[in-house]
Structures are given as structure tokens and as C-alpha cells.
From Swiss-Prot:
GO biological process: bundle of His development; chaperone-mediated protein complex assembly; lung alveolus development; negative regulation of cell differentiation; negative regulation of transcription by RNA polymerase II; positive regulation of gap junction assembly; positive regulation of skeletal muscle tissue regeneration; positive regulation of striated muscle cell differentiation
A Pfam family assignment: Homeodomain
GO molecular function, one term: histone deacetylase regulator activity
Role according to the record: Atypical homeodomain protein which does not bind DNA and is required to modulate cardiac growth and development. Acts via its interaction with SRF, thereby modulating the expression of SRF-dependent cardiac-specific genes and cardiac development. Prevents SRF-dependent transcription either by inhibiting SRF binding to DNA or by recruiting histone deacetylase (HDAC) proteins that prevent transcription by SRF. Overexpression causes cardiac hypertrophy. May act as a tumor suppressor.
Protein origin, superkingdom: Eukaryota
Record's GO cellular component terms: chromatin; cytoplasm; nucleus
Gene name per UniProt: HOPX
Tissue expression pattern: Widely expressed. Expressed in the heart, brain, placenta, lung, skeletal and smooth muscles, uterus, urinary bladder, kidney and spleen. Down-regulated in some types of cancer such as lung cancer, choriocarcinoma, head and neck squamous cell carcinoma and oral squamous cell carcinoma.
SMART domains xrefs: HOX
Record feature DNA-binding region, as residue ranges: 3-62
Annotated compartments: Nucleus; Cytoplasm
Transmembrane segments: none
SUPFAM superfamilies: Homeodomain-like (SSF46689)
Stated name of the protein: Homeodomain-only protein
Length: 73
């Protein structure tokens, strides 16, 4: 059975995405997003979707509304 499913990235891809989310930028610009997508072997759309969902998860864990952009909003 393959590690990759139709519904999401592989473990290796998630590791790359998580590293960039935690160490590089939670709000990557389009150029950075393109570079992360290339590094992970995903499309820009898949990468953008992953970051959007991961950011909402992070906000919830921090007790913030999932739609706000920062602590000051």
C-alpha cells in the first residue's frame, strides 16, 4: 500500500510543509509558496490549501478565531 493517498500529501511532503510552516513562514508569499511546492513535489494549489488548513489548525490551538490573520486583528 502506498504512503500517498488521494486525499493528501505523503509523510515526507508533510515533513517539508511542517518545517516551512514552523521555521520559515506561516504566511508565505507567492514566490515562497512556489518554492515550497517545488521542494515538496506538490502543486502550488495543493501547497496553498495545506498552508490555509494548517494555519486554521494553528490558530485554533492558540485560542484564536480561525479567520483572523494575526493576534492584533
Amino acid at each position: 500500500m502506498s504512503a500517498e493517498t488521494a486525499s493528501g500529501p505523503t509523510e515526507d511532503q508533510v515533513e517539508i510543509l511542517e518545517y516551512n510552516f514552523n521555521k520559515v513562514d506561516k504566511h508565505p508569499d507567492s514566490t515562497t509558496l512556489c518554492l515550497i511546492a517545488a521542494e515538496a513535489g506538490l502543486s502550488e494549489e495543493e501547497t496553498q490549501k495545506w498552508f490555509k488548513q494548517r494555519l486554521a489548525k494553528w490558530r485554533r490551538s492558540e485560542g484564536l478565531p480561525s479567520e483572523c490573520r494575526s493576534v492584533t486583528d
